[in-house]
């Protein structure tokens, strides 16, 4: 009888240990899954922060560039009547508007959440600011030529696009947001 009880106790102990060890494995898997999810979460946050930053840039520009957009719309008309052409006053307002956008962009701070891309984003914002400043300077002339400003703007778009591509996102076009 003693052998039977010892065998039964050994079997119970074996089953107990087997059950506990499978529990530990599932806990380990849960911990690994949580660690993986936590590691993946910051990437998603960077993407969200990047989109928030981009939208913030667009809002800042749109808040200041109304007169510039009005001037560009008038200047872009095909076969306009003389009264529809932009006036010197329109040009002066557009110049002030472009300078205000440049000043606003120059004061833009890169969020801490985007510190991994800070240098690239700062370079892109500086290019955008330089493009608007070039427009402001050209608008002070009687016959403004925006080719240099457009080239600088294109460089800024490419710089911002590279940051987006580094995060495996489609590059945006700020020009579509602000015009």
Question: Where are the regions a protein language model picked out?
Answer:
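Polyanion-binding interface signature
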Residues: 91
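Short, solvent-exposed, charged loop/turn and helix-capping segments
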Residues: 98-122, 174-178
């Amino acid at each position: 009888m003693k052998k039977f009880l010892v065998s039964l106790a050994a079997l119970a102990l074996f089953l107990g240990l087997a059950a506990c060890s499978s529990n530990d494995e599932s806990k380990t898997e849960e911990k690994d899954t949580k660690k993986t999810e936590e590691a993946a979460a910051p990437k998603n946050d960077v993407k969200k922060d990047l989109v928030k930053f981009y939208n913030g840039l667009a809002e800042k520009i749109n808040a200041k560039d109304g007169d510039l957009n009005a001037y560009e719309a008038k200047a872009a008309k095909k076969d306009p009547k003389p009264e529809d052409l932009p006036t010197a006053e329109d040009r002066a307002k557009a110049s002030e508007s472009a300078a205000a956008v440049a000043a606003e962009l120059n004061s833009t701070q890169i969020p801490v959440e985007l510190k991994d891309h800070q240098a690239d984003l700062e370079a892109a914002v500086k290019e955008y600011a330089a493009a608007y400043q070039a427009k402001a300077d050209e608008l002070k002339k009687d016959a403004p030529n925006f080719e240099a400003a457009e080239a600088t703007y294109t460089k800024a778009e490419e710089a911002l696009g590279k940051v987006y591509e580094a995060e495996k996102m489609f590059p945006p076009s700020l020009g579509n947001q602000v015009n």
